[in-house]
């Protein structure tokens, strides 16, 4: 397209400016409920069935984070090979989910977990291990007990 035609089109579309009529730009506000209704109607077309009794869903990502759904609504259409999981999702690090998630990990995740496990003890030891200098400073902060306070309180009571 040549530059002259493009300049004419741009001049026609100009919004605002001195002496020109302003063209209102339409703004479409989408709400979550509208999106949810569209999603539910699409799922209804796929003939999904509700799956009851699922307490939690964990989706493990490659970067070591887990998308965790607690008490989700799970719908499935086996003919369309489609699963829909709706509910409140939380992104958590895999280390936070560790004891209960081990049975759900695949071979890929187990190798990445081993690497994480090798790094984790080093980080914990580096951050939590008190240095000998720190121990001495903590002792200096606590004053030594010089008097017996029990005798003073007994004298005040009499």
Curated annotation (Swiss-Prot):
Residues where Phosphothreonine is found: 111
Pfam families, sorted: NAC
Compositionally biased intervals (Acidic residues): 134-150
Domain NAC-A/B, chain residue ranges per copy: 33-98
Residue span of region Disordered: 122-158
Sorted UniProt keywords: Methylation, Phosphoprotein
Residues carrying N6-methyllysine: 5
InterPro entries: BTF3, NAC_A/B_dom_sf, Nas_poly-pep-assoc_cplx_dom
Disulfide bonds: none
CDD domains documented for this protein: NAC_BTF3
PANTHER family xrefs: TRANSCRIPTION FACTOR BTF3 FAMILY MEMBER
Family: Belongs to the NAC-beta family.
Protein name according to UniProt: Transcription factor BTF3 homolog 4
Organism: Homo sapiens (Human)
